């Protein structure tokens, strides 16, 4: 496994989740924007625009990618709750990260968005029943089913994965 690419390992989709795990994931979801803000704090423009690995995104793009991805994840969750196992739409995250907004805007814009989004998402999850967490959506192309408890675990991992990218990058570059 490439430590630069997967600093906390790859995602392992859980096959079940109990109430304790759900509560932990919801708490982790609430905490993630704060941890991301801390990881990216006090970086100057040059540092924000430095890729965390060869062929990887700049720190700025990582922050904006998390907002883009998690908005999609939140909407997918709402679709699964209101439609019968919907086929969701994917997005080209590489192309999105290459758009001008992801390459140039202040990361604080996406950090503020993530603060609010994660609070909404956590409140939604706190309102769900066990049966709700079993609802799912389908990825086009692969046909993979993602239950809502699995999606919650995925987006918590995704947050931690990119926070670890930024923290490890800062350490390698001596920016701590």
Curated annotation (Swiss-Prot):
GO terms for cellular component: cytoplasm. Coiled coil: none annotated. It is found in: Cytoplasm. Its cofactor is Zn(2+). Keywords: Cytoplasm, Hydrolase, Metal-binding, Zinc. SUPFAM superfamilies: DinB/YfiT-like putative metalloenzymes (SSF109854). Gene3D superfamilies: dinb family like domain. Binds 1 zinc ion per subunit. Its main location: cytoplasm. One of its GO terms (molecular function) is hydrolase activity. Its EC number is 3.-.-.-. Belongs to the metal hydrolase YfiT family. Possible metal-dependent hydrolase. This is Putative metal-dependent hydrolase BLi00869/BLi00870/BL03027. It comes from Bacillus licheniformis (strain ATCC 14580 / DSM 13 / JCM 2505 / CCUG 7422 / NBRC 12200 / NCIMB 9375 / NCTC 10341 / NRRL NRS-1264 / Gibson 46).
């Amino acid at each position: 496994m490439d430590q630069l690419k997967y600093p906390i390992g790859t995602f392992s989709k859980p096959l079940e989740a109990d109430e304790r795990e759900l509560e932990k994931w919801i708490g982790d979801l609430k905490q993630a924007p704060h941890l991301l803000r801390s990881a990216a704090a006090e970086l100057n423009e040059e540092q924000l625009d430095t890729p965390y690995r060869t062929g990887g995104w700049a720190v700025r793009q990582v922050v904006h990618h998390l907002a883009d991805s998690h908005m999609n994840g939140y909407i997918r969750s709402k679709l699964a709750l209101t439609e019968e196992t919907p086929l969701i739409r994917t997005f080209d995250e590489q192309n999105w990260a290459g758009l001008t907004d992801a390459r140039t805007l202040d990361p604080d814009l996406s950090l503020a968005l993530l603060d609010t989004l994660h609070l909404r998402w956590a409140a939604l999850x706190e309102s769900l029943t066990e049966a709700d967490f079993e609802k799912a959506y389908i990825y086009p192309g692969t046909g993979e089913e993602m239950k809502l408890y699995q999606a919650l675990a995925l987006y918590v991992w995704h947050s931690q994965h990119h926070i670890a990218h930024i923290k490890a990058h800062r350490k390698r570059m001596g920016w701590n």
